[in-house]
């Protein structure tokens, strides 16, 4: 236990952007009834399941990184979405990062994806299935123009819009994060049916993928949901504010990660005490 505490203190003393985290040392899901615990950016998951790597409807990228775990609700969503994509002849759905076996904080790449309810899905739908080499070293397609204000017309495909719309219309989905330029294009193309657009939220990056987030499962009593997105389609002043010049702010100082939810801390303590 002393070694574990000393190791943890050493870890949190490093900048959280680059620090290794103890969650990476948990290589298998924690047994128990599935529970998403805490918030999306400060939580963990019990009873996570691995997304099957073999499917006719989707492919999992970078499987060597073992970020393909999630709450069963997330796996069910991926199956629903990829099945609908196939039935609509959109192409193969490319699955990016989900969560680690017990959730928790990544060393890099994500602040969220911690409670087993987030998944990155790439905004390209290949007609031909990718080879194992392509899956291990996938090449994203940047859909956003260099000025950040619009998508690249030659790269924008109606199948991508249809995929986002299918995801947004899923009852378990609460938010889909995309680049502001992608949200802008969706607003232009949506037509009369705009009810799904309020779930699509502009956010930094996300130029080649969408980040889908599910609601807390009803039986995950320690899971913390976000507030519901504002009413409306989000295509007005809120969206335009993303394209306005921003005044530079003071460089933020280094911050330590917030305290873990007690159940997540207990999970870590029990895991390392057993080693």
UniProtKB/Swiss-Prot annotation:
Record EC number: 3.4.24.-
One Pfam family from the record: Peptidase_M74
Co-factor remark: Binds 2 Zn(2+) ions per subunit. Zn(2+) ion 1 is bound in the active site. Zn(2+) ion 2 is bound at the dimer interface by residues from both subunits.
Residue numbers binding Zn(2+) 2: 147
Reported function: Murein endopeptidase that cleaves the D-alanyl-meso-2,6-diamino-pimelyl amide bond that connects peptidoglycan strands. Likely plays a role in the removal of murein from the sacculus.
Family: Belongs to the peptidase M74 family.
Subunit structure: Dimer.
NCBIfam families: PRK09429.1 (NF006947)
Record's protein name: Penicillin-insensitive murein endopeptidase
Organism: Yersinia enterocolitica serotype O:8 / biotype 1B (strain NCTC 13174 / 8081)
